[in-house]
């Protein structure tokens, strides 16, 4: 049986500003968007007068089964809950492993992804972890992507003392395997790269792009503030760059928006990941935990403190991410798309 809702008088950023309109929802889809919408069937009415209606946020870097911790087994971090996500406007997540492949598995990751889906969220995940050889479910990166519905790419670490110091040829082969599997399964097949502060930077990736036929969009560096100049060089060749939300991110995003095309810039939270603090000799001296709320907090600061317009700011966690990950039903307020919606009171913006 179909269930209908009409959201009335919302100021819609789709993410572009389309003014005050009504939205008709049938089950989990938006089926009409227009001013003064007339609908005669039984339905629930939601008065959104004085509120902004924007797409649900897409967070493409979430430790949904908790990060590994890097200060002993007692520092293992708890798994995320659906309520942790939706209370901060996140309606779609991509889960992944980090340094924790010895104590947590791809099986656990896929199971948690399925659990979030059962609870009503849109959820995906990545095979792999920091390490090479790559941790997989089927024994093959390509088969994981091709045959496991939830898996849309692979995770690896570069330029970090905790990585496996992957060789250029290993990264190139990983990318081609992901690309081929992604084409077969109609998935992005991304190589999602934790990028540390190591001496190598993006050197190997930039050389692969220069020396091979692998499209630069196959590689998706995150934590790009760690190697900002290399990230700009990468973006100048057409690559996507993903920032990690923290208190310094809004000003860096503002700077980047003046240099890099908007569509290539995304933001993620690293929620429930471990945030180790290192001294100059790479000894651990402290530990933090990534928080889901930093995603929206960074966008809010980008609007209020850096004076970036609302449409541009929210694109970084909605449309841009959806387009980059081939999530065609996500990321914008349009007829026929998933009804992943966030309502914001004016006080929030």
Outline where the language-model segments fall.
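Divalent metal-coordination and catalytic microenvironments
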Residues: 10, 28, 50, 61, ...
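Short amphipathic alpha-helices and their capping/turn segments at secondary-structure boundaries
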Residues: 42-49, 82, 140-145, 250-262
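Buried, small/hydrophobic-residue-enriched core segments of structured protein domains
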Residues: 99-110, 121-214, 221, 226
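Active-site core of metal-dependent hydrolases
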Residues: 162, 177-278, 284-285
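Conserved small/polar residues in nucleotide/adenosyl-binding loops
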Residues: 347-349
């Amino acid at each position: 049986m179909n269930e209908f809702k009409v959201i009335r008088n919302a100021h819609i950023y789709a993410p572009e500003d389309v003014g005050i309109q009504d939205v008709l929802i049938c089950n989990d889809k938006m089926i009409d968007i227009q001013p003064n919408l007339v609908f005669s069937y039984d339905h629930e009415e939601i008065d959104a007068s004085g509120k902004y209606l924007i797409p649900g946020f897409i967070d493409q870097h979430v430790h949904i089964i908790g990060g590994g911790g890097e200060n002993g087994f007692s520092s293992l971090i708890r798994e995320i809950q659906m309520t942790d996500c939706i209370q901060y406007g996140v309606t779609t997540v991509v889960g992944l492993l980090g340094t924790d492949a010895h104590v947590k598995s791809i099986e656990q990751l896929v199971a948690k992804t399925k659990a979030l889906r059962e609870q009503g969220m849109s959820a995906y995940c990545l095979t792999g972890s920091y390490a090479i050889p790559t941790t997989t479910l089927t024994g093959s990166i390509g088969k994981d992507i091709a045959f496991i519905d939830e898996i849309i790419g692979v995770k690896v670490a570069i330029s970090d003392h905790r990585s496996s110091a992957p060789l250029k040829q290993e990264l190139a082969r990983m990318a081609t395997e992901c690309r081929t599997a992604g084409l077969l399964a109609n998935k992005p097949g991304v190589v999602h790269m934790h990028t540390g502060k190591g001496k190598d930077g993006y050197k190997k990736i930039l050389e692969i792009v220069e020396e091979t036929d692998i499209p630069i969009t196959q590689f998706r560096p995150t934590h790009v503030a760690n190697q900002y100049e290399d990230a700009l060089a990468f973006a100048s060749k057409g690559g996507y760059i993903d920032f990690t939300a923290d208190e310094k991110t809004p000003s860096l995003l503002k700077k980047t928006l003046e240099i890099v095309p908007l569509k290539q810039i995304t933001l993620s939270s690293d929620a429930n990941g471990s945030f180790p603090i290192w001294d100059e000799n790479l000894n651990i001296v402290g530990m933090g935990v990534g928080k889901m709320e930093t995603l929206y907090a960074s966008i809010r600061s980008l609007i209020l403190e850096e004076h970036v317009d609302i449409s541009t700011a929210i694109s970084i966690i909605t449309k841009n991410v959806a387009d980059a990950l081939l999530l065609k039903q996500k990321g914008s307020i349009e007829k026929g798309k998933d009804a992943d919606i966030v309502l914001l009171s004016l006080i929030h913006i």
